[in-house]
Amino acid sequence: MEIDLPDVLAEVTAQFARYEKALVNNDVAVLDELFRNDSRTLRYGIGENLYGFDAIMAFRAARSPVGLMRTTDRTVITTYGRDTAVASTLFYRDAWAGSKVGRQMQTWVRFPEGWRIVAAHVSIIDQS
């Protein structure tokens, strides 16, 4: 298996950038597009465990659009072969004033319709 094929890495990096832009702008349509529409897709959030695309979609639709802006740091995207990738990043929000750091990991898989997130985990810890 080849790791970090340049063309595949570029594709996933572009999709990750689309996700980040959609997230901070609360573009729910793009966020929904980027998660796999499947009952096995999951997202472990800061305060919720979401099982299945429908639960993820409902969470996004109900979430407040206020306070979503963030900056990312130490983003690492690794591809495995041509159809699987993991994206990991740290993120910060101004409201945290340096006291907390968020962590996000996503597993991406290439399907006929394109790259989709099949699993995601978001958490926040105190910054030391």
What are these regions (language model features)?
Residues 37, 73, 104:
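Residues that flank catalytic or metal-binding motifs in active/ligand-binding sites
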Residues 1-7, 68-69, 84-85, 116:
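C-terminal-biased regions
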Residues 11, 46, 55-98:
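Surface-exposed, charged secondary-structure patches
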Residues 19, 31-32, 40-41, 52, ...:
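Hydrophobic pocket/interface hotspot
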Residues 51, 94-97, 125-128:
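A short local loop/turn or secondary-structure capping micro-motif enriched for an aromatic residue
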Residues 101-128:
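Short beta-strand edge/turn micro-motifs at domain boundaries
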